[in-house]
Amino acid sequence: MTIQQTPEELAQEVKRLVSQLQAQGRNDLLLRAIGVPLLEELRIEAAKGKLSRLVITKDYRFILVDYNNKEVELQPVHKAVYLLFLAHPEGIEFKRLADYREELTRYYMATAKMLDKEKIIEGIDHLVNPLDNAIHEKCSRIKKVFLDMMDEYTASYYYISGHTQKRFAGSSRIWYERLKIITLPRDLVSRLELFEETGIVFGEETEV
């Protein structure tokens, strides 16, 4: 009769096997056994203890509630870009931003209520133009703001970063999507109420 091991016992067995592989210098086999997707899940799980919930208020203030309610100071255009990437955890290629023009415009109009509509449209034109450097500049600014607030490892979950994904078509065609994503687990993103202007909904309602 086989005695079923408890999760804790299985964890100890895994730890023992990992130690044996590392002692033999075979991290390559360890990585192959774990797999990259699981490795990323483990990385996120390990970081959760350091990550703060991000609360987006009804007037589009970005608050890190677990870091003493620190506010992420961003201009309306940066907030609009950030909201777009938050809404698409699957990632977006910069060269395809024009496909998200309408959605990005809604976010910008919601975050920049005092700005003239023509100025908003002009700003969107720059952002979705693949020959313009505007989106790179905005993402660099967002990255700097988070780096100024926390260490680089923690900040990497909050800012917009690159992720290359291998794609297959049939038996011979292979191509790569160069996606830009925010890796922050979406269960850490909350809102104080539904965003009626944009239709965007993140996580659960919470209080600051």
Map each language-model feature to its residues.
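Intrinsically disordered, low-complexity acidic Ser/Thr-rich regulatory segments
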Residues: 115-133
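Short, solvent-exposed loop/helix junctions and linker helices
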Residues: 71, 75, 129-136
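Short boundary/linker motifs that mark transitions into or out of structured domains
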Residues: 30-83, 88, 189, 195
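Short amphipathic alpha-helical recognition elements used for nucleic-acid or partner binding
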Residues: 70-121, 142
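Short, flexible coil/linker elements and helix-boundary hinge sites characteristic
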Residues: 25-26, 35, 49-50, 112, ...
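Extended catalytic cores and adjacent scaffolds of nucleotide/polyanion-binding enzymes
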Residues: 196-208
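Long, compositionally biased intrinsically disordered regions
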Residues: 1-40
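DNA-binding patch around the recognition helix
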Residues: 40-51, 134, 139-197
